[in-house]
UniProtKB/Swiss-Prot annotation:
SUPFAM superfamilies: dsRNA-binding domain-like (SSF54768), RNase III domain-like (SSF69065)
CDD domains, alphabetized: DSRM_RNAse_III_family, RIBOc
Protein name, entry field: Ribonuclease 3
Lineage: Bacteria, Bacillati, Bacillota, Bacilli, Lactobacillales
Keyword rRNA processing: yes
């Protein structure tokens, strides 16, 4: 953790008071499960908290930045910014990946470079920072790391297949779109989800991914491809 602390101090002027919070943020469930006798905490609860504060700060930023955009447009842009792949890229930008504590199985399966884990790590770090320093410090960090990328328009062309599918189908009439997990496989540290996308209870396509969100995006992408071939 000493090297991580040095990184945070030199790159972001962040010094944690509660070092345990920082360590927990970088501890994956697979590591905690392999060391159960030590009663080690993992980062899922911090991820939950970080997700909430991230949504709040990005929502406020977009609301003030684009006073004439409708709610739907703001929601779409926010979803692009806070999606799994985007958050994983921010973890990489911050050089967080070498410091994640992973179980042996997760490490061997390439977990250190997996978007799901890196995205969750970024949210967990925000949760830890919130508890240790407060919301304004989280805002300062995001203004340094995320907002410059948003200002450059790097999230305006991200493929949001779920939104695209919804827009196409609803343009044809009233359509209720639903996503359902139909299968889960793999160990806890390397889950794989299969999702089916339905339109008015009629199956359109399926998708597979390392997270439910990614599987849903893949299902929507496959549905769009099928519709384009009709």
């Amino acid at each position: 953790m000493k090297n991580l602390e040095a990184l945070l101090k030199s790159s972001f002027a962040i010094e944690f008071e509660d070092k345990t919070l920082l360590e927990t943020a970088f501890t994956h469930t697979s590591y905690a499960n392999e060391h159960r006798l030590l009663n080690i905490s993992h980062n899922e609860r911090l991820e939950f908290l970080g997700d909430a504060v991230l949504q709040l700060i990005i929502s406020e930023y977009l609301f003030k930045k684009y006073p004439h955009k409708a709610e739907g447009e703001l929601s779409k842009q926010r979803s692009m910014i806070v999606r799994e792949e985007s958050l994983a890229s921010f973890s990489r930008h911050c050089a967080f990946e070498p410091y994640i504590k992973l179980g042996k199985g997760e490490e061997k399966s390439g977990g250190r470079n997996r978007d799901t884990i890196l995205g969750d790590l970024f949210e967990a770090f925000l949760g830890a920072l919130l508890l240790d320093k407060g919301v304004e410090e989280v805002r300062r960090f995001l203004n340094q790391v995320m907002i410059p990328q948003v200002e450059k328009g790097n999230f305006e062309k991200v493929n949001d297949y779920k939104t695209s599918l919804q827009e196409i189908l609803q343009a044809k009439g009233d359509t209720i779109i639903d996503y359902k997990v139909i299968n889960e496989s793999g160990p806890a540290h390397a889950k794989q989800f299969e999702v089916v996308v339905l339109a008015n209870q009629v199956e359109l396509s399926k998708g597979i991914g390392r997270s439910k969100k990614l599987a849903e995006q893949n299902a929507a992408e496959n549905a769009l491809k099928a519709l384009s071939e009709e």
